């Protein structure tokens, strides 16, 4: 039984169980998490997004309370299954956001059905197509699936290592949030199938980034050790409609580390389509990517108490 303030749902589509959180009404926005997470990756963003959007945050296949079948976990396969899930709950056109491995699935969703995606927010994952360095730990997991299973089976240790090594020390999530993440990564079967995402990565249909003609926002943590900022160099050459924001004093898990700043950037990016049409961000010289949101955090009703002071 869920004890939080979110609306939880389950359904089965083509034999695959889906668990998701849904809040709000309006244009749909789909939020996809990465590893080692669940729908809770977006729990700080959902309440504000739900003021204007129908927010859909699923546990991805193999994670949380969704189904964990053995079989094909190639990104293009999971993307097709996610599209079938969206069909089943009546979502045709949508905005989409992904963090970490959620970006991989979102990229593949756009590759399969670009006309269905209105706007795209990618968080903390550069383009694997032209920088193999981005995939070193993915390659290890894919080549050592049994060892990856053993590591993930100890959810408490696995999650803590990921967050302690990936967040900027002074911006790490608190103990209560870490325990929530551990709980969601502790469901039976997760450690057996999540490594298959890595093992099957080469089985996926190649992504054609020329299909990414919708507006795209890239959000990057300033001190992300998993995806150093230099990995983003040249991304705008592959995605012509790209805008970007650098989240200061944050590591890899920006939705937890700097929740107000991420929510603010997402709302401004999405709202620009609904209203103003003004330039989204001030430009900087940092790899040609823009870095500064033009609206205050309070503009979207976000609790300023969770916004930490920016450095410098």
Where are these regions (language model features)?
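Flexible "cap/lid" subdomain of the alpha/beta-hydrolase fold that forms the substrate-access gate
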Residues: 2-6, 18, 28, 63-65, ...
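Short acidic-hydrophobic surface loop/beta-edge motif
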Residues: 7-13
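Conserved residues in the N-terminal Rossmann fold of short-chain dehydrogenase/reductase
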Residues: 10, 57, 246-247
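Conserved HGGG/HGGXW glycine-rich cap/lid loop of the alpha/beta-hydrolase fold
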Residues: 16-65, 226
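A short, glycine- and basic residue-enriched loop/turn
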Residues: 38-39, 104, 250-251
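Generic recognition of short, well-ordered alpha-helical segments
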Residues: 40, 44, 230, 257-260
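Catalytic active-site module of serine/aspartate enzymes centered on a nucleophile-bearing elbow/loop
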Residues: 242-312
């Amino acid at each position: 039984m869920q004890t939080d303030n979110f609306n939880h749902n389950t359904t089965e589509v083509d034999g695959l169980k889906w668990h998701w959180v849904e809040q709000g009404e309006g244009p749909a926005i789909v939020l996809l998490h990465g590893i080692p997470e669940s729908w809770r990756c977006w729990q700080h963003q959902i309440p504000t997004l739900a003021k204007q959007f129908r927010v859909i945050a699923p546990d991805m296949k193999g994670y949380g309370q969704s189904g964990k079948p053995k079989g094909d976990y190639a990104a293009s396969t999971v993307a097709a299954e996610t599209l079938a899930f969206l069909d089943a709950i009546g979502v045709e056109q949508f905005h989409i956001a992904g963090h970490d491995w959620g970006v991989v699935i979102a990229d593949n969703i756009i590759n399969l059905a670009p006309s269905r995606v209105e706007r795209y927010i990618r968080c903390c994952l550069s383009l694997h197509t032209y920088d193999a360095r981005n995939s070193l730990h993915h390659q290890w997991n894919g080549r050592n699936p049994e060892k990856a299973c053993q590591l993930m089976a100890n959810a408490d240790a696995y999650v803590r290592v990921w967050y302690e090594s990936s967040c900027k020390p002074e911006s790490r999530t608190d103990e209560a949030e870490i325990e929530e993440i551990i709980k969601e990564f502790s469901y039976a079967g997760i450690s057996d199938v999540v490594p298959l995402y890595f093992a099957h990565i080469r089985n996926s249909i190649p992504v054609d980034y020329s299909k990414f003609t919708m507006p795209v926002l890239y959000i990057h943590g300033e001190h992300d050790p998993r995806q150093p900022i230099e990995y983003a160099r040249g991304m705008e050459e592959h995605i012509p409609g790209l805008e970007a924001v650098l989240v200061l004093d944050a590591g890899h898990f920006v939705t937890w580390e700097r929740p107000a700043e991420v929510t603010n950037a997402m709302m401004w990016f999405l709202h620009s389509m609904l209203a103003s049409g003004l330039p989204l961000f001030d430009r900087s010289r940092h790899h040609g990517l823009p870095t500064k949101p033009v609206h205050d955090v309070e503009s979207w009703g976000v609790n300023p108490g969770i916004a930490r002071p920016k450095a410098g």
